[in-house]
């Protein structure tokens, strides 16, 4: 008020914005805030599809996927198809706790070369609904193996699960991106097994620790981190893209997320806030 009074006496224009005094410092946590956080609630009205949802697609594996290591028997188990009209690999996603004939949705992955140049989306929803955030891909098919092994490896992409299954490894699941939703965390906790977080190359180690922290200390949790540069830098490849020998090495030398790891995360967070 005093400032406003003095401005009036001197005939000066008075303006004040309460945000003017705030520092315009770069937010050190911006990299994490860029990830869109979504909260998912279980909707009893979410439709569940049966095998008829795949009738318009060809029941054949895509040859380039076979060359990459996704075997026909894996495609058959996960009911992978192909759409000639849309030029997309058809990927149905079974409900994690449903029957073999229950799907929550279908996505199509383009096979068009240089699709970015033509503004063609890499993935496209082929079903009316597809609430990925309330499901964990591959858990329906791999549940028994995961229980027997006592752990599950959480990957990003559906194809990564298919690659591991092609190598006779039924412990992998996929969450669809690099951040677990609250519902996916609840689903994985319910398995009562070790959770191994294995995100793609290039993901910051502190982001990985944040994902591990969602399970700690309720479940034993660990993470795969390539300290040996076995995965090409800048490739954004998944550990599942590596030869089986490399993948097993990374899995064997996974890092247990414990109090020491958690302290590193908290120290980093505090340091970023101070800066």
At which residue positions do the language-model features occur?
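Short, solvent-exposed polar/charged micro-motifs at secondary-structure junctions
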Residues: 29, 84-88, 115-117, 231-237
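TOPRIM fold recognition
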Residues: 163-275
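Short, flexible coil/linker elements and helix-boundary hinge sites characteristic
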Residues: 11, 79, 119, 150, ...
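Phosphate-handling DNA/RNA-contact segment within nucleic-acid enzymes
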Residues: 85-191
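TOPRIM metal-binding catalytic domain and adjacent DNA-binding surface shared by DnaG-type primases
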Residues: 2-90, 94-95, 262, 266-275
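Short flexible/disordered coil segments
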Residues: 1-10, 143-145, 150, 210-219
